[in-house]
Structure formats: C-alpha cells, structure tokens
C-alpha cells in the first residue's frame, strides 16, 4: 500500500476522511463570466480580446487596457467587494498587517497608518474619510466566495498561485507611490473611477518589488481613467501609480496577481540540484574532488571556470531527452499553498469518494486533475539509507481556503500519497484522463492494482464509474 505524505515525515498507511467545507452565501448578482473550464473562464475575463492575441501581443510584453460600457458586467464587478463587505468582515475579526493595511502616498513615499491588533470598521472609515487613507484588504478570496471561484479557476489556468488585494481609495488621494511588482497584474475596477499612469520598466519582468522615484520614471506610456467593468493588465516590472480624482466618489479596485517566482530561472534553480545529484551517481568525474585550497582563493582560477563550464555542457547534453527531472519543490509549493476546488453548497457530496470501492472489474477516472501533481523524488523515509526514488502524489483538495496567500509562518500540511517507482506507468495511465478498468493497470499483481485504485479513491482523486 502507498503511504500518506505527512509534513513530519511520519508516513502512516491510513485512509483519509473527506473534509467538510463551510461556504458563505454567493453574491446576489449572477456571474456573467464563463466558469465551465479554466480556459473558458479566462477567455470571458479578457473578452473581447482573443486569448491567442493576448499571449502573442501582451503577456509579459506590454499593458492591455479593456474599457467597457457594460452595466451588467459593472454590477457584477461591484458585487465582488464593497465597503459593506469590509464592515461585515470587521465584525468577524480582521487584523492590521495580516488582513488589512491603511496607507497613503505622501511626497513619493508610502506612509503606513496601521494601528495594532484588531481592525474596527469605524476606525478604518475614520482614517478613510479624515486622513484620505487607502484601505488595502489582503486576499479577500478567503472570505468572498465569488473571488474564491475566480482565483481557483485562474490557478488552474496558469498553474501558478493567484493572489488578490482590494484597494479602497477616497477622492483626491493616492495610496501607493510609483512602483513596480514581481507579478503579472490584472486590475478590475469595481466602484468609482481611478486615474492610472503606467511607465516603461526600468527592470523588465522584474523578480522583486521596488518603489521608483518620480525623477527616474519619465513620462507615462499610458494615462487613462478606469471605470466600473473595465479591466487592465500589465506585466511584472511595469512602473505604475494610481489616484482617485478629486470631486468624484471613492474608488474600489481589485488587483489579481500571478506568476511570482515562476520564471525559467526559478525552474532551473528548482531542477538543477536534483539533476546534478542524479548524474553524479553515473559520472565519476562529477564525484572527483575540487583542487586543494580552492575555497580559499579570492578569485576563481581560469582552469576551474573551464572545468565548471565543461560540466555544465555535459549536464545540458544529459538533459536532452530526459523525461523525469528530480524536481518537486515548485510543484509541491504550488499545490501546498493554492486554493482548494470551489464547491457549491458545503462541498461534502463532491469530496466524498462514494460508497462503491474500486475493484478489479470497475472502471475508474481521475478527477480534480488540475489540483494534483505527480513527481518523482527520493524516499523521505529516514530509515532508507539508499535513498531510493519513489512517486509522490500531492493534491490541494483539503487545503484550507482561509489560509490562502496570507504568509503565515506556521508550516501548513501538504496532502498526498507515496508509491513505489514501479507504479509510475500505472499512474500515468490514470493521469491521461480517460476512464480505465482497474485490472488493465500496468502492475504485476491484481492486489497492487486494487491497492493503487483504493488509495487514490480514499483521497477522492478518482471516481468509480
């Protein structure tokens, strides 16, 4: 039998109990977006721009402004978050720093006006009205069901974590100074009007957040007003600032962000150490020692640089045609921290694997494929000195929505299973998505076939048809 993946490394063979999910009421306004699939959702989100056009001409390249005059869409956007939502959430308990920030841009610098401890709506509204401060609410998808629904679909579409923030800014005020982010940004204008100015990046596709001074950013490449129902996209590194015009009502906009630490460089950092570890087992040259006293040198000698360059070329040659990379940290981090599947009602029926256990003659099919990753890695059993490779299945079905993207220091649990490497072909059969009979799985014995199906079924990863 495979073993459950536990964060402590204690991997016991015990079945899981399907979790129950408590949901709040859906917004009264019916969604005007298409949630049939991740692809159809993204297509409807950026409509009327075609998806092919977006990725060919705008993604990671330049901003896209979609201005709409659509009262139905504007009403739907308004339902995503409002001051009344903030008031309701304050009654339940929100805290400065973790849930909400109060800030204002003064002379090109961000001034934080947070108090300590729990945030009360009357105090927030006082700072909003009297100090002209912006209220920033972190990760509202933890509480607003429709945002959970939206961001879960986007995480499936991009295969990357998707966070969000709501910015509520009074008239004649600006919350943040000019800056750029390390994420791809989608702005949805929910209420009021916001004056945006975008500038050419000083660091294209930036890998970190930074504030830029006014004398460095030059003149805007884009200068426009965003109104309810409008959508704005810009790549990471795009310098931007926004203010609510004087004489108008307050502005509320939603920032949806993704692709943080999701570059080719991040992929190489994640993959290369495990790959070198694997190849060193086969290549004695990689296991030979470095020159004496090399670590004491102030500069790297030319012959050492040539040696390392040669090793890198060898690794590149070995990488060609290799199907399995000993890389799991990015996959594991994504699944561990992403949103669970969105469910209508309380979700208990969908999460229940059902009463029928999978037997040899049963046909099974994978479900929640976008919420599961399969990776090969060393056995984490502390008693396995040989460090044999095993197959890990990680999933997000039991992730806690209220913990999504809030950066708590506590180590959250990751859910999944562990199988012998001999099971990888059978798992790939299931992963193709087509229904398959249990007895047709590529395993040596009927017992192994049933045990594999039963383990996946116990985690609600497969359906018995």
Swiss-Prot record:
Fe cation binds at residues 179, 181, 240. GO terms for molecular function: identical protein binding; metal ion binding; peptidyl-histidine dioxygenase activity; transcription corepressor activity. Gene3D superfamilies: 3.90.930.40, Cupin, JmjC domain-containing ribosomal oxygenase (ROX), dimer domain. GO terms for biological process: regulation of cell population proliferation; ribosome biogenesis. Pfam families: JmjC_2 (PF08007), ROXA-like_wH (PF20514). PANTHER family: MINA53 MYC INDUCED NUCLEAR ANTIGEN, RIBOSOMAL OXYGENASE 2. Belongs to the ROX family. MINA53 subfamily. This is Ribosomal oxygenase 2. The lineage of its organism: Eukaryota, Metazoa, Chordata, Craniata, Vertebrata.
């Amino acid at each position: 039998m495979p073993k459950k993946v536990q964060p402590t490394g204690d991997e016991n063979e015990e079945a899981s109990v399907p979790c129950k999910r408590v949901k709040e009421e859906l917004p009264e306004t019916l969604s005007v977006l298409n949630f049939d699939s991740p692809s159809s959702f993204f297509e409807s989100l950026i409509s009327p721009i075609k998806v092919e056009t977006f990725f060919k001409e705008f993604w990671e390249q330049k901003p896209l402004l979609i201005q709409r005059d659509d009262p139905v869409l504007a009403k739907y956007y308004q339902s995503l978050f409002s001051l009344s939502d903030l008031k309701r959430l304050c009654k339940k308990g929100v805290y400065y720093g973790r849930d909400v920030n109060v800030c204002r841009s003064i002379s090109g610098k961000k001034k934080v006006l947070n108090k300590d401890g729990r945030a009360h709506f009357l105090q927030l509204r006082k700072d909003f009205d009297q100090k002209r401060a912006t209220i920033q609410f972190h990760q509202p998808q933890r509480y607003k069901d429709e945002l959970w629904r939206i961001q879960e679909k986007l995480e499936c579409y991009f295969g990357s974590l998707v966070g969000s923030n709501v910015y509520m800014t009074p008239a004649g005020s600006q919350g943040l100074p000019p800056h750029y982010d390390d994420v791809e940004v989608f702005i949805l204008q929910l209420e009021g009007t916001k004056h945006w100015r975008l500038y050419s990046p000083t660091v294209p596709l930036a890998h970190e957040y930074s504030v830029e001074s006014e004398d460095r950013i030059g003149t805007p490449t884009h200068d426009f007003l965003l109104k309810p129902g409008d959508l704005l996209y810009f790549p990471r590194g795009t310098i931007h600032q926004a203010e609510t015009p004087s004489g108008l009502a307050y502005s509320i906009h939603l920032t949806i962000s993704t692709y943080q630490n999701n570059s080719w460089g991040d992929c190489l950092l994640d993959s290369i150490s495990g790959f070198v570890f694997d190849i060193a087992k086969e290549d004695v040259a990689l296991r030979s020692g470095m020159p004496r006293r090399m670590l004491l040198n102030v500069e790297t000698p030319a012959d050492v640089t040539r040696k390392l360059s040669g090793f890198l070329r060898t690794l590149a040659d070995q990488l060609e045609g290799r199907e399995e990379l000993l890389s799991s940290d990015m996959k594991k981090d994504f699944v561990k921290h992403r949103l669970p599947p969105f469910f209508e009602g309380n979700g208990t029926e969908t999460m229940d694997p059902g009463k029928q256990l999978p037997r040899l003659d049963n046909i099974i099919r994978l479900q929640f494929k976008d919420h599961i990753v399969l990776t090969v890695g060393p056995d984490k059993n502390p008693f396995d000195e040989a460090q044999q490779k095993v197959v890990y299945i990680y999933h997000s079905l039991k992730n806690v929505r209220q913990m999504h993207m809030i950066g708590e220091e506590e180590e959250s649990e990751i859910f999944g299973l562990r199988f012998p490497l001999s099971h990888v072909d059978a798992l790939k059969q299931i992963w193709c998505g087509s229904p398959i009979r249990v007895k047709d799985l590529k395993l040596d014995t009927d017992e192994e076939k049933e045990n594999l199906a039963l383990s996946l079924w116990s985690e609600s990863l497969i359906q018995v048809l």
